[in-house]
């Protein structure tokens, strides 16, 4: 690592323990000009974006070459943003659980267009459309909002340019004076004008990202290696920069994503409101979230350091060639060396991926960085083409959102909802009522004891899940058009493909693709529970339905022997056992087939199935009663598509084989398997890396979809609990994000330690 990056890293880790100040509460555009109330809401939103760019705090940090600091926010603890809506608009939105913070994020801007054209050209494009639009007031308002919003980037960049110019006069060395002057010059050019150099391209992307993340948009940066490489290549060939300078520039860029991290939970502020989760969570999510945040059992602390900032490298180009380049490798190497948790790094592999990308991936995973997340192009791309109807060129150009969900890069409006299939089983067993509080959680399918065959029981369960899907999709379709009435995204819409051509905000069906992912949640627990019922109740008849339900109602109290039996003697998903895996295959087939029916009926949005919890598995388990697989009431669920915690006993390959028995092209939004591994039985590091590379190739060959690997021994995790300062850079994967282990609450750490430690 270069001397500059070493200093930046040292500064960064010191700042982790300093309180980050929140800014922007109680601001309003009406304080500046009360007459703005007469303007259309989308234009008022754009003016609020300008206000943020004009007034937000700015600073240039020591040694850095890329400048810009987004305002403080986080997925776990909310946002701040100036008021632009009237009282009447706020009241109307609240009736459908929305507010000005109801911006979904999870999208990729089309950065290639920004770099190629610059924002000024996009503003001129919007003006041209406006001039041609005379009889559609809604379209005119949209174009006016984009024309107003995009210059916010120039406002912010100009402020940084002026600050850099001032600091040049205060610089202690000639070298730093020169760097400040270069930064000032670049900030006066990009992102409004096209980028011409590697430094300009990086600063252009970061300035836009800073504006987006300071104005409620939690966006990712997409295929960063594909759009940055031409600038790097040209500068290297023209000898404008050296390899070390390129690493300094890229490293300075990557560090910026981590600058809002806080490792001292006492510094966390809660700015969460009902609107922050209104577009994807269940109705009681805010209440549950706040309760969980203050509960000693779990904390949302890990989400306080999450901003949905993903980048993805390598994989096929739109033309079908391998896209691995020097930036692909350098991104992985630098995030590894700098020991960052942001940006989240993902890598796209396929059957012909070059050895060099596998090598840097395996070395990062072996170090224990819990990154990169591995995507299999040979499953994802055909899945998009066959089952979502996406043209192959756009499918090959897929990216991911802030966690892992796959979507065509720069062209997609995306949303998801949790379909809690374990609650569907609870509903079937308890006549539509929660085991925790008796509240209605589903339909009453009658007395489950009267379902006298496995086939009848399984069919009843699948109907329960379909009912839950119906509710989620009906809500999505019913309330979709409410969002632009309170929370349009004019800045993002201006840099999202097709919005300008259609004359529509992204939230008004402006993007080329609209994907909604109903994500199966609690998969492994549901399938393991169904295996218990099939085997013990219907086949062996050693357990009555009445006794099982009684045990669940009593949270397994008085039935510990039975609980241990179902946990240890009945086959479990994740062990390459066809008995239980076949139940999962049949269930997933029914689930995907039902969504196929919806895709035949609804033509303006596409439903993309997946399996996912993200980092929310404690909260998602908190609302579930005890389950037939032996899980206790309110215990955390397994993450994503992973085996239940501690139930995968036959090694990582067996876990992967269980997960790939279903055709994963049909789970085309994604279904990550999260594994914890250890090299303690391997003779040396190089042998371990070779084994890991072989495992990754096998994962691709077997038809896997998404894989995460955290390489850390149980003993190391326990030692980190005792001496957190010695392990401040220890990272673990939490379903949808990577977190510093020491920042998690102890119960969350303990839950992670319970995960099976697979050896090679």
PLM regions: where:
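Mature N-terminal, pre-catalytic/accessory segment of carbohydrate-active enzymes
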Residues: 1-2, 140-166, 170, 175-189, ...
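Conserved catalytic cores of very large enzyme subunits
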Residues: 1-143, 179-181, 190-193, 197-760
